[in-house]
Structure formats: C-alpha cells, structure tokens
C-alpha cells in the first residue's frame, strides 16, 4: 500500500511549539519545507495541511490543531474525506523509548501510553494498523516525570540530535517512495545522530 497521508502530532500554540511532544510536527514542517509545500490551516480537517507529490503519488500532510489527546479528530476527518485506509497513513510522534538522535518506522502496535496515538486508534475504528515514525526524545527515568518531560523543551545538545534524526527520517520517507519501505527502514534504523 502506498502512503497517502502523513501526520505529525503536536499540541497547538506557540507555548508548545518547541516542546518534545511536538517532535512529530517538526518532521512534517521539515518535509513540507524540503518539498516546497507550505502548510495552511484547513478548519474542516482540524489542522494545517498541504499536498505533496512523491514519485507520482499524491500525499497529504497534516498537523492537527487539536490538542494531542484529540488528534484522531483531525486524522479521522481527513482519512474519511479522502477514503484513506489505516495502512495508508504514517503518523510521526515523539517516542520516550528511543534516545534523542534515533528515529524508527513501525507498522501497527499499541499506543504505549501516547494519548495522540490512543485517540487516532480509536477514531480509526480501533484499528492500530497504521504506520508510525517514532522520533526518539529519551525518557526522564521516572514515569511520574513523563508529563513534565514531554511538555518541556529539550536542551540544545538533545535538540540537535533530534533535528538530525528528523532530517534523516525525512530523507528516508522520500526513499520509501522511491525504493520501498524495506530499504528506507534499513537505512533509518542504522542511523544514530552523534
């Protein structure tokens, strides 16, 4: 299946723009910039959207303007309107279980406590079988500190690693369309920013 919708999860507003929880949106912003496809607000899809063409395939980009725990509202609206199936969707999100500087593709699975993923699974009819781009942000080491951690800004040294991983993920997304998921996954999964 070709990917028809790429989503970057985030919380809306300037106060959240630089927080770890918005790593998915950073990836979409970079992809839109690389492909010269500026995002614009589209209220009927509850988010910022753009359309790109990769290897002849029409692909929609989406950054929801809902809060993270309501991300499924935007994803569900766009998927329904364009008749996009779950396995044609790639969702980029921050990942506590990967260190900064690492990003990985994954198909399906649970939500791992991520409220954005949880809502998307629910709004896609409890179907978790969409692709994910997991952008490593690291873990605070104590589960009671997770909320403050994801809503905090990474130090400059970590931000640099996250940005490098996102840059590689954007390149590997283009590679996915050119040479397939296996090749893109192999390249991305051997990358670690230093």
UniProtKB/Swiss-Prot annotation:
GO terms for molecular function: peptidyl-tRNA hydrolase activity; tRNA binding. TRNA binds at residues 16, 67, 69, 115. It holds the Pfam family Pept_tRNA_hydro. It catalyses: an N-acyl-L-alpha-aminoacyl-tRNA + H2O = an N-acyl-L-amino acid + a tRNA + H(+). Coiled coil: none annotated. The record marks 11 as: Discriminates between blocked and unblocked aminoacyl-tRNA. InterPro entries: Pept_tRNA_hydro, Pept_tRNA_hydro_CS, Pept_tRNA_hydro_sf. GO terms for biological process: protein quality control for misfolded or incompletely synthesized proteins; rescue of stalled ribosome. It is found in: Cytoplasm. GO terms for cellular component: cytoplasm. The record marks 94 as: Stabilizes the basic form of H active site to accept a proton. CDD domains: PTH. The active site is at residue 21. Keywords: Cytoplasm, Hydrolase, RNA-binding, tRNA-binding. Its EC number is 3.1.1.29. It is an enzyme of class 3 (hydrolase). Monomer. HAMAP family: Pept_tRNA_hydro_bact. Hydrolyzes ribosome-free peptidyl-tRNAs (with 1 or more amino acids incorporated), which drop off the ribosome during protein synthesis, or as a result of ribosome stalling. Belongs to the PTH family. This is Peptidyl-tRNA hydrolase. It comes from Salmonella paratyphi B (strain ATCC BAA-1250 / SPB7).
């Amino acid at each position: 299946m070709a990917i028809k919708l790429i989503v970057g999860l985030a919380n809306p507003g300037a106060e959240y723009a630089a927080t770890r929880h918005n790593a998915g949106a950073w990836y979409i912003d970079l992809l839109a910039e690389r492909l010269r496809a500026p995002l614009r607000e589209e209220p009927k899809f509850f988010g910022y959207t753009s359309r790109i063409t990769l290897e002849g395939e029409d692909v929609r980009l989406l950054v929801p303007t809902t809060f993270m725990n309501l991300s499924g509202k935007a994803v569900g609206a766009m998927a329904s309107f364009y008749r996009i199936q779950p396995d044609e969707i790639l969702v980029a999100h921050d990942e506590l279980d990967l260190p900064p500087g690492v990003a990985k593709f994954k198909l399906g699975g649970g939500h791992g406590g991520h409220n954005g993923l949880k809502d998307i699974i629910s709004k896609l009819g409890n179907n978790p079988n969409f692709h994910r781009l997991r952008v490593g942000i690291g873990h605070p080491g104590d589960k009671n500190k997770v909320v403050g951690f994801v809503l905090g800004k990474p130090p400059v040294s970590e931000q640099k690693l996250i940005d490098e991983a996102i840059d590689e993920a954007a390149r590997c997304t283009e590679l996915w369309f050119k040479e397939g998921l296996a090749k893109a996954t192999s390249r991305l999964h051997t990358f670690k920013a230093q």
